[in-house]
A protein has these predicted regions:
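Histidine-centered, transition-metal-coordinating active-site segments
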Residues: 1-203
Length: 203
């Protein structure tokens, strides 16, 4: 497994001899972007992200160790770039998406703080591993357990934990968890000036 991980890291860092592989996994036209654009378009009901990814892949070729696109695929590439831009404004940077992400990060951060203090929290085995262990990038590289638990994590682990945490005695954790479950999200306020200290205290 470590050999496969080393190979994947080499490709991702563009240290592997076949340079076009890096472009396939980390570039403006990488496979992940093609995949999530179609997937997110489907699940959000935003038609702008519905691109012809199969046609784009079919039009790709390798020239001098770099990915190239056949001339007849240019319009498909233009459509992909425009679709991605529209998806960012309509979905990824939408105020509800931003608020949800911020609340989830804050909820997990609070859970981690409590766990490291020794507070007992409900969590699946995979989620528990990350809550009760100080994890850094080095451990991801060196620890098979870390990678294995990360692979086991999915949405169900998080949502189940949030439901249980919504009744926890810690006010911060329970409030954030209930907000996520009941969709009572943070409000987004756009301003051109810096937030004053008084406004921060009010919030």
């Amino acid at each position: 497994m470590k050999g496969q991980l080393n190979l994947a890291i080499q490709i991702f860092k563009d240290e592997y001899p076949k340079k076009f592989l890096h472009q396939l996994v980390s570039g403006q036209l990488d496979m992940d972007r093609l995949d999530y654009l179609r997937r997110d378009s489907f699940y959000t009901g935003v038609s702008e992200g519905n691109i012809g990814s199969a046609r784009i892949i079919k039009m790709l070729d390798v020239k001098d160790d770099h990915l190239v696109v056949e001339s007849k695929g240019i319009y498909s590439i233009e459509n992909f770039l425009m679709s991605r831009r529209l998806m960012y404004w309509q979905v990824y940077l939408h105020k509800t998406s931003v608020a949800s992400e911020k609340m989830l990060v804050n909820t997990l951060t609070r859970a981690k703080e409590l766990a490291l203090r020794g507070v007992e929290l409900f969590a699946s085995p995979a989620l528990r591993f990350f809550l009760y262990h100080p994890i850094d990038k080095k451990e991801f590289y060196n620890s098979p357990d870390c990678l294995e638990n990360f692979i086991q994590l999915d949405d169900n682990d998080i949502w189940t934990a949030l439901k249980v945490w919504s009744n926890h005695s810690d006010v911060v954790l329970s409030t954030l968890s209930r907000g996520m479950i009941n969709r009572k999200l943070f409000k987004v306020e756009v301003t051109s000036s810096s937030i004053t200290k008084a406004r921060k205290e009010e919030i």
